[in-house]
Regions:
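Hot-dog-fold acyl-thioester-processing enzymes
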Residues: 1-55, 59, 118-123
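HotDog/MaoC-like acyl-thioester-processing domains
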Residues: 3, 70-123
């Protein structure tokens, strides 16, 4: 775990995915991918890749700029911007975009990572 480290994942959501989400959330399936599904890609990265297993999600702030069409790959990226090993905290920048570069959302996240993930202080 180091400042500047990144992780990326990509996924396209189908009409069937939206119907399943609508059934779980009590909403209706629309013509675009719902923002919570897009934000879920960031959540996945934080819990599975960076920092990864054992991470405790504290805060996420995403500002959405565009709608995501169905069956179009969405790429989510997170980057470590600050490490606070004394508190086991990690600040990250997050972004989701379409293949043409259109930014769907961007923002930040704060997580608590297991102490063993931080580099030794050298003290």
């Amino acid at each position: 775990l180091s400042s500047g480290a990144t992780a990326t994942t990509a996924r396209a959501f189908s009409a069937a995915d939206l119907r399943a989400f609508a059934g779980l959330s009590g909403t209706h399936a629309g013509a675009h991918v719902p923002e919570p599904l897009i934000a879920g890609l960031v959540s996945y990265l934080l819990g599975v890749q960076l920092p990864g297993r054992g991470t405790n999600y504290l805060k996420q702030e995403l500002e959405f700029h565009a709608a995501a069409p169905l069956d179009t790959e969405i790429t989510a990226t997170v980057e470590v911007t600050r490490l606070r090993p004394e508190k086991c905290l990690v600040d990250l920048w997050a972004r989701c975009a379409l293949p043409d570069g259109t930014e769907l959302c961007a923002g930040r996240a704060l997580v608590k990572a297991p102490a063993g993930m931080f580099p030794a202080s050298g003290a």
